[in-house]
């Protein structure tokens, strides 16, 4: 399969094949595995659903997390700046916010990994 490149802010960005995690998503999956092992969550899946937002507009969240009480959450993983802000393209943030409004039976979260120089912890923000 031929890789497609996108030109973003002066840099080329290569698209990953569907179902392939980037480094930040891989690190977050390890956090979810630990939560599942301890029983804090029932299970999680990577990119299991695609939400239809409008004609020719779709959104695939990174993770769906199910809790023992049956509650479901959508977790979108993004890198964070040193200051704690999320590194996300404007169109991605619009899609996440629209999806959260259209599908209110999920709780929606942005999850971000701070850089090591800022502590390397995870930051969460409910949408």
Q: What do the predicted segments below correspond to?
A:
Residues 1-127:
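Electrostatic, structured charged patches in enzyme active sites and in nucleic-acid/phosphate-binding
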